């Protein structure tokens, strides 16, 4: 070992092939904890940039409607930038499909084209405009946990994303850019820890 080397000078790394079919990137959903406007006001703020599709529910239909909402988000989100929205005290889920006029141009940087970048710029910055509001956002990889936090009052709004594709991560890295904050959750995680 080199002179002066200490064990704390090293970092544990795991290298995996990007093409490995077992390598998955899970979405990192946002849950706001600061007060948000009513749904009508949120709709007015977002309707110019997004096509909104509402999934209203009752206590008896909430589970089935939630499943339809998540399926619509996953299926349609493969074609266009799309997000999911749920607000505390509101009995509907909403998908937000970015209108063509507001999508990044083909020559935009790979980072600018990411769903997570678009969500941050167009939705989070609109609903949580101050740094303090953005710092109070909670994160989860689980759709149902995000929606449950809002239903139970832990959060005021859930913003659901589709997962970043491994190819998108590669494109950002190849362009010499950094991924946005909380944009990837690689799975499976390597086992770490101490054995005693």
Predicted regions and their residues:
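Surface-exposed, charge/polar-rich loops and edge strands
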Residues: 1-196
């Amino acid at each position: 070992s080199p002179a002066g080397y200490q064990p704390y000078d090293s970092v544990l790394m795991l290298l995996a092939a990007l093409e490995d079919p077992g390598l998955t990137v899970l979405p990192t959903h946002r849950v706001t904890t600061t007060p948000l406007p009513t749904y009508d006001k949120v709709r007015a703020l977002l309707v110019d940039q997004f096509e909104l599709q509402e999934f209203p529910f009752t206590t008896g239909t909430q589970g089935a409607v939630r499943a339809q909402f998540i399926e619509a988000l996953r299926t349609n989100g493969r074609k266009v930038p799309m997000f999911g929205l749920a607000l505390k005290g509101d009995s509907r889920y909403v998908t937000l499909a970015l209108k063509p006029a507001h999508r990044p141009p083909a020559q935009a940087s790979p980072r600018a084209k990411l769903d997570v970048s678009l969500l941050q710029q167009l939705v989070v910055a609109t609903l949580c405009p101050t740094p303090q509001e953005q710092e109070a956002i909670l994160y989860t990889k689980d759709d149902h946990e995000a929606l449950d936090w809002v239903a139970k009052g832990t959060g005021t709004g859930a913003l659901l994303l589709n997962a970043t594709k491994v190819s998108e991560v590669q494109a950002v890295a190849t362009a010499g850019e950094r991924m946005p904050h909380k944009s990837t959750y690689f799975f499976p995680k390597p086992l770490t820890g101490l054995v005693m």
